[in-house]
C-alpha cells in the first residue's frame, strides 16, 4: 500500500528513467533542422569526426544526441523512414545496458541501428544477436545500406562459413549472427592450435534481439562441442526391445517403489522411476536377453552403464513424444524447441537420451559423444563488456534479468495507444469440446472477413487443429517446424481478409503481420514491376487493409496456456501492432498439460460446483486467477532451476576462464621453454619426494622404485644405486640435483638433433594437446560429480558447497597431471637422425610391397581360410580406454600403449 502511494507521488522507476531520457529526445529533435541542411558527404563525415572526438577523451554518452540525430537523418535519406521518439528512447535504453521492452510492430530492428552505430564508433565491434540465420541475414541486409552510408562495415556470421569468412565478419564494425554461432565460435577459438585459427575479437558489446528467448528460454541449454565416444548402439537396441513389456503406474501420487505398475512418471520434474515390481521384471528380461547374468542386480557397480541405458530408454518411451518433442525426418531424430516450435538441426540430447529415442524410432543410432568444450548462454553473454537486449515481453521476467544478468528492464511506451481487446479465457472439460469451440469461432470470424492466427504449443496439436479445419472445409496455412522454409512468407500474408494461419508457439517471430497482407511481398514476387503495377498493388492492399480493420483486425486464438505467461503474451502481441484494431482469446480444457499438472484440482472443483454440462465453457475471474497462479508456480520453479544451474555452472565457469586464459597465453607465445624448465623441476621434485621423502633416513629410500619410475615415465635409465654405493658422501640434495641435471642434459641432446626451433614448436604442441585431453576428461568427471552431488544432502551436507570443494580438488589434481604428462611425453619422445628415418622408411616400403604380394596370393586361395582369419580378428576384444593395459604395466590403456595408438 505504502509503495503504491509513493509510486503515485514520485512515479515508478520506469517513469523516472523515461522522464530523464525524454529530455535527451528533445535535444535530438532540436538538432533535426541542422542535420537536414547537411549534404550526404557532410553527414558521412560525422562518423570520422565522432571517432576522433572519442580518441581525444570524449565519452559515448556525450555523443548520444548528435550520433542519434545523424542516424535518424541517414535513415530518412536511405530508407525514407524517420525514427519515432519512442525508438530514440529504446535506443538510449539499449545503450544504457538495459533491456528494452518494445511491443510487436514498434520497429525494434530500426531501433537497434541507433545503439549499434554509437557503440561501433569505438572500433571494438558490435554483435547483434538473433534467434535464427534467416533473421540475422534479413536484418543485416536490410540495415547494410544505412550503415554503409555512414561509413560502417557490416558482417554476417552464419553457421558453416569457413574460418577466413568468419574472421572477416567479426572484423566488421557491426556483425549480425545467431546466439548459437557466437557461442560455438567462442568455444572453437578456445580449441584452436594457432592464433591464426581464432576468429573472434575481444567481446565488447552484444545487442540481443528476442532477449527473453535467448537468455531465459535457452538458458538451461548448454552449448556443447563434442567428439565421438565408444560405440554402444547395439545395447540401445537390445534395451529398447524390453521397455514395451513394462506397464506405467496409473496413480501418480502412489508410492514410487511399491505401486501396481512397473514405473512411475513425474511429469513436473520430467523424471521416470522404476517400482520394485518393475525392477524385478526388468532384471528377468535382461537375463532372458543375455544382457545380464543370472543372480546379478541391476544396481551392482558392474551394471552402472546398463542402468544408464535402461533409464535413457524409459525416458525416451515415457517422456518424449514424436511431433511434440522431436520429429523424424530423413531417418534422423531432430529436436523441436519447446519454446519456439522450431527444429534444432544439429542439436542432440545428452546422457544417451538421443540414442535411446533413435532406437525407439528404429532409425540409425549415432555414436554417443564426449564433451570437448561447453558453456551456457548465461555465462557466454556475461563475458561481454556491455550487454543489452530487446523484446516484446520482458516485464514478467524483469527480476530474473536483474538478478542473473544485472540488466534492468525498461518498458518503452508504444508510438500509438494499444486498442487490442483481450478477452477472458474459456475453459472446457475435454479437449474435443475445446477444439470444436475453436472451429466455430474461426468460422464466425472468417465469415466476417477477419483474419485469424491460431497458436498451438506443439506440432502434434497444430496438426489436430489443421485436420479439424480441413473437415470443416476452412482453407488455412500451417506454420510449424516441418515447414520452416516458408515461415516468413506465411506470416507476412497472415493478415489477409479471412486468412487462417496455424502457428506452433511463436514460429515466425521477427516478421510483422500486416493487416490486409504484405504489398511488399507481392511486389517482390514480380520480376520487373512497373510503377503502375506497384501503385495498383498498393491500392488493392489499402482496400483489403480497411476491410480487415472494419472486421475487427487480426484475431488471436490460443489453443492452450503455455507454462510461461510471457510466451502467451508474445502470441497476443501479434495483434494490435502500431495502434491497429485486434482481439485475442485463449481456449483451455481440463486435459491440457498445464491444467492437468498444476491447476486441475482447484479448477475441477469450481467446474463441478458450477454444474458444467458437455460443450459448456466456464468464463470466470476465479478460473483466470487460478490459471495465472499455476503459471506463476511454473515460472518460479523454472527460475529456481535456471538459477541453480547457474550456481553450479559458475564453479565450472571460473575453471573454464582460467584454462582458456592460460591456453590463449600459450597460443600467443612461440617459446614455452621457460615454462617447460619450470614445470620439469616441479615434476622431478614430486617424483623424487615420492620415493625419497625429504629429510629422511637412507633406510626409508625406495631407490629401486625410483629407478623404475624414472625409466618408465621419463625414459631415464640412471644407475642411482651404483652412484650411492660408489659415492658414500652423496647425500639427498646432491642426488636430487644430479637426477634433474641428467634429465636436462638428455633433453638438450635431443634438442641438438632436431634444432631449437623444431623443439619449441613440439613443446607448444604437446602442452596444448595434453591440456585439451585433460580438460576433456575433467569435464566428464565434473559432469558425473554434478549428477550425484544432491545425494550429499542426505548426509546433512550442502551439495553446492561440496560440489565447489570437490571440483576445486579435481581441478588442482588436473593441473598437477598436466605438468606430469607434458614432461613425461617430452622425455619419452624418440628423436631419429635423418639417415635412420630414411632406413626405416625404406624398410616400411619393402614390408608394404611384401604384404601386397601376399594379399594377391591369398585372393587366389580358398575363401574359407580367409573367413576363418576374419573371424579370428573380429573375435579379439577391443580394449577400452579406461581398461587395464594388456602389456601388464598395471596402468590404464589410455595412459600406456593407448597413447601410442
Swiss-Prot record:
Q: Which HAMAP family match?
A: SecA
Q: Where does Zn(2+) bind?
A: 885, 887, 896-897
Which cofactors, by name? Zn(2+)
Q: Which PROSITE patterns match?
A: SECA, SECA_MOTOR_DEAD
Instruction: Please name the CDD domains in this protein's record.
Output: DEXDc_SecA, SF2_C_secA
| Stretches for region Disordered | 852-901
Q: What protein does this entry describe?
A: Protein translocase subunit SecA
User: Which GO MF term does the entry hold, naming one?
Assistant: ATP binding
Q: What does the subunit section of this Swiss-Prot or TrEMBL entry state?
A: Monomer and homodimer. Part of the essential Sec protein translocation apparatus which comprises SecA, SecYEG and auxiliary proteins SecDF-YajC and YidC.
Q: Where along the chain is ATP bound?
A: 87, 105-109, 512
Q: Which PANTHER family match?
A: CHLOROPLAST PROTEIN-TRANSPORTING ATPASE, SECA INNER MEMBRANE COMPONENT OF SEC PROTEIN SECRETION SYSTEM
Q: Where are stretches of biased composition, namely Basic residues?
A: 891-901
Catalytically driven reaction(s): ATP + H2O + cellular proteinSide 1 = ADP + phosphate + cellular proteinSide 2
**Gene Ontology BP terms:** intracellular protein transmembrane transport; protein import; protein targeting; protein transport by the Sec complex
One CC-aspect GO term: plasma membrane
Q: Which family does it belong to?
A: Belongs to the SecA family.
EC number annotated for this UniProt entry: 7.4.2.8
Briefly, what is this protein's role? Part of the Sec protein translocase complex. Interacts with the SecYEG preprotein conducting channel. Has a central role in coupling the hydrolysis of ATP to the transfer of proteins into and across the cell membrane, serving both as a receptor for the preprotein-SecB complex and as an ATP-driven molecular motor driving the stepwise translocation of polypeptide chains across the membrane.
Amino acid at each position: 500500500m505504502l509503495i503504491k502511494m509513493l509510486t503515485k507521488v514520485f512515479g515508478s522507476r520506469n517513469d523516472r528513467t523515461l522522464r530523464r531520457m525524454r529530455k535527451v529526445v528533445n535535444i535530438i529533435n532540436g538538432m533535426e533542422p541542422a542535420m537536414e541542411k547537411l549534404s550526404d558527404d557532410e553527414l558521412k563525415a560525422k562518423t570520422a569526426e565522432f571517432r576522433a572526438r572519442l580518441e581525444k577523451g570524449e565519452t559515448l554518452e556525450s555523443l548520444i544526441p548528435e550520433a542519434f540525430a545523424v542516424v535518424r537523418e541517414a535513415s530518412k535519406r536511405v530508407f525514407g523512414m524517420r525514427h519515432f521518439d519512442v525508438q530514440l528512447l529504446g535506443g538510449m535504453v539499449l545503450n544504457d545496458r538495459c533491456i528494452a521492452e518494445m511491443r510487436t510492430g514498434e520497429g525494434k530492428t530500426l531501433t537497434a541501428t541507433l545503439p549499434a552505430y554509437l557503440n561501433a564508433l569505438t572500433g571494438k565491434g558490435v554483435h547483434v544477436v538473433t534467434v535464427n540465420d534467416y533473421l540475422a541475414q534479413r536484418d543485416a541486409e536490410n540495415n547494410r545500406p544505412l550503415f554503409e552510408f555512414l561509413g560502417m562495415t557490416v558482417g554476417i556470421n552464419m553457421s558453416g562459413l569457413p574460418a577466413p569468412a568468419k574472421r572477416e565478419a567479426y572484423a566488421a564494425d557491426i556483425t549480425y549472427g545467431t546466439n548459437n554461432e557466437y557461442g560455438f565460435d567462442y568455444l572453437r577459438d578456445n580449441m584452436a592450435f594457432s592464433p591464426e585459427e581464432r576468429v573472434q575479437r575481444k567481446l565488447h558489446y552484444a545487442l540481443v534481439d528476442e532477449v527473453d528467448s535467448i537468455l531465459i528460454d535457452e538458458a538451461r541449454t548448454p552449448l556443447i562441442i563434442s567428439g565421438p565416444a565408444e560405440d554402444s548402439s547395439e545395447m540401445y537396441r537390445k534395451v529398447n526391445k524390453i521397455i514395451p513389456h513394462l506397464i506405467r503406474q496409473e496413480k501418480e501420487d502412489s508410492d514410487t517403489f511399491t505401486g501396481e505398475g512397473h514405473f512411475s512418471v513425474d511429469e513436473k520434474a520430467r523424471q521416470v522411476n522404476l517400482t520394485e515390481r518393475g525392477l524385478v521384471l526388468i532384471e528377468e528380461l535382461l537375463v532372458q536377453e543375455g544382457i545380464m547374468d543370472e543372480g546379478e542386480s541391476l544396481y551392482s557397480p558392474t551394471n552402472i552403464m546398463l542402468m544408464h541405458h535402461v533409464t535413457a530408454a524409459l525416458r525416451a518411451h515415457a517422456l518424449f513424444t514424436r511431433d511434440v518433442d522431436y520429429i523424424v525426418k530423413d531417418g534422423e531424430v531432430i529436436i523441436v524447441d519447446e519454446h519456439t516450435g522450431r527444429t534444432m538441426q544439429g542439436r542432440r540430447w545428452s546422457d544417451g537420451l538421443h540414442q535411446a529415442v533413435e532406437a525407439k524410432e528404429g532409425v540409425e543410432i549415432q555414436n554417443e559423444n564426449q564433451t570437448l568444450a561447453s558453456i551456457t548462454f548465461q555465462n557466454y553473454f556475461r563475458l561481454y563488456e556491455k550487454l543489452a537486449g530487446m523484446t516484446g515481453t520482458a516485464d514478467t521476467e524483469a527480476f530474473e534479468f536483474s538478478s542473473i544478468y544485472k540488466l534492468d528492464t525498461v518498458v518503452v511506451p508504444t508510438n500509438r495507444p494499444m486498442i487490442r481487446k483481450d478477452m477472458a479465457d474459456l475453459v472446457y472439460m475435454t479437449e474435443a469440446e475445446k477444439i470444436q469451440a475453436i472451429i466455430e469461432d474461426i468460422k464466425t470470424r472468417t465469415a466476417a472477413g477477419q483474419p485469424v492466427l491460431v497458436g498451438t504449443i506443439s506440432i502434434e496439436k497444430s496438426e489436430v487443429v489443421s485436420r479439424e479445419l480441413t473437415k470443416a472445409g476452412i482453407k488455412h496455412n500451417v506454420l510449424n517446424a516441418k515447414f520452416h522454409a516458408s515461415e516468413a512468407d506465411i506470416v507476412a500474408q497472415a493478415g489477409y481478409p479471412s486468412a487462417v494461419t496455424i502457428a506452433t508457439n511463436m514460429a515466425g517471430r521477427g516478421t510483422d503481420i500486416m493487416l490486409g497482407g504484405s504489398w511488399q511481398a507481392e511486389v517482390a514476387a514480380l520480376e520487373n514491376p512497373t510503377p503502375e503495377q506497384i501503385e495498383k498493388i498498393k491500392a488493392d492492399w489499402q482496400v483489403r487493409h480497411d476491410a480487415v480493420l472494419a472486421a475487427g483486425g487480426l484475431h488471436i486464438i490460443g489453443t492452450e496456456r503455455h507454462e510461461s505467461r510471457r510466451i502467451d503474451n508474445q502470441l497476443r502481441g501479434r495483434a494490435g501492432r502500431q495502434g491497429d484494431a485486434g482481439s485475442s482469446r485463449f481456449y483451455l480444457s481440463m486435459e491440457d498439460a498445464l491444467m492437468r499438472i498444476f491447476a486441475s484440482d482447484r479448477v475441477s472443483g469450481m467446474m463441478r460446483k458450477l454444474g458444467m454440462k458437455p460443450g459448456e465453457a466456464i468464463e470466470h475471474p476465479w478460473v483466470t486467477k487460478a490459471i495465472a497462479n499455476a503459471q506463476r508456480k511454473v515460472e518460479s520453479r523454472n527460475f529456481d532451476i535456471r538459477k541453480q544451474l547457474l550456481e553450479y555452472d559458475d564453479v565450472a565457469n571460473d575453471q573454464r576462464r582460467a584454462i582458456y586464459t592460460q591456453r590463449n597465453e600459450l597460443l600467443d607465445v612461440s617459446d614455452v621453454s621457460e615454462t617447460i624448465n619450470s614445470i620439469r623441476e616441479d615434476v622431478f621434485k614430486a617424483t623424487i619426494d615420492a620415493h625419497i621423502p625429504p629429510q629422511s633416513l637412507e633406510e626409508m629410500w625406495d631407490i629401486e622404485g625410483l629407478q623404475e619410475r624414472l625409466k618408465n615415465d621419463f625414459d631415464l635409465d640412471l644407475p642411482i644405486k651404483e652412484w650411492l654405493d660408489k659415492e658414500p658422501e652423496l647425500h639427498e640434495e646432491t642426488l636430487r640435483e644430479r637426477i634433474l641435471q641428467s634429465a636436462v642434459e638428455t633433453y638438450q641432446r635431443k634438442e641438438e638433433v632436431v634444432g631449437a626451433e623444431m623443439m619449441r614448436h613440439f613443446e607448444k604442441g604437446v602442452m596444448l594437446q595434453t591440456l585439451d585431453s585433460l580438460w576433456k576428461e575433467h569435464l566428464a568427471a565434473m559432469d558425473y560429480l554434478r549428477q550425484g552431488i544432491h545425494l550429499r544432502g542426505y548426509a546433512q551436507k550442502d551439495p553446492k558447497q561440496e560440489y565447489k570443494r570437490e571440483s576445486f580438488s579435481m581441478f588442482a589434481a588436473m593441473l598437477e597431471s598436466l605438468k606430469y604428462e607434458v614432461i613425461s611425453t617430452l622425455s619419452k619422445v624418440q628423436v631419429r637422425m635423418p639417415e635412420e628415418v630414411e632406413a626405416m622408411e625404406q624398410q616400411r616400403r619393402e614390408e608394404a610391397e611384401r604384404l601386397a604380394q601376399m594379399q594377391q596370393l591369398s585372393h587366389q586361395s580358398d575363401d574359407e581360410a580367409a573367413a576363418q582369419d576374419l573371424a579370428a580378428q573380429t573375435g579379439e576384444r577391443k580394449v577400452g580406454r579406461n581398461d587395464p593395459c594388456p602389456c601388464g604395466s598395471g596402468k590404464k590403456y589410455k595412459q600406456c600403449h593407448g597413447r601410442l595408438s
